């Protein structure tokens, strides 16, 4: 199989990841729940992984990195823990439902004000709209770093400057960029960075988290066992315990730690360069095929390793099925949990076929994918 669905999850991971998970299952106890060897090993692994993530994202404090099951949970924690009745938030048409649905629910249930920066037919935003939508009660701007549909990358540093100039926080969904595009929380002005472990970070599914700037207060979304202060009625308020009620996925975190070793040794810039080259090769190979429409801004200097397209008026699911059944190529059709972006692109009925690349793909695989698109378009 030629796997080109890396924006959904990376299938091909460093072999160290699986080995680390198996070893953890054989040796680890429960982190912060005891002083025996197994519990201490789990605690060391968890904290060591926090330190690696802090280094990767330039997060000021490792103890302000909170583990979750995925970026959806991380975003729910951040959005629900920061926005309250009377607050206002700004988001964009570029968002995944993991941002949209928590915001919609707060709009309905807490009366949180909500405005969106619209995207054009190429999925681009006007940064002046962020400034125009700011209100006196704007508490946060919540936005993705990279659209999971178009691959367009937002200028997070520019958005962060606008947010902070008006006293608002910046919450960033880094699901599509963590591990594949350099992220510096300090330089970009990110207050809360939400990430998942199973995509560009090449870790196991069931891992993710938040990186929180010191001074940012997030109310606990869930409370319960913490391993410390057990006689207190309330959840401990220090990070990361404040937001980590219950047993952590230490086995998955061990796998994530192994993946981070590979990324930190290789360098995110090197991974980005390779993935960009594969993406660009595919784009150049399909953009002029008769009947093919490609979505997104390919003139931008920085973008995710994503190419989304349609072939004539063919249903996107039918095209994706043909790619899988006739060519052994895995892609993602449909709506991609990005309804506002599909409306901006005019693809709500047809959907679109997304090709997404990783550093484990090859140029030969890209050439096979180009050939497949050309042949389907000729039918």
Regions found by a protein language model. Name each.
Residues 1-379:
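Pyridoxal 5′-phosphate
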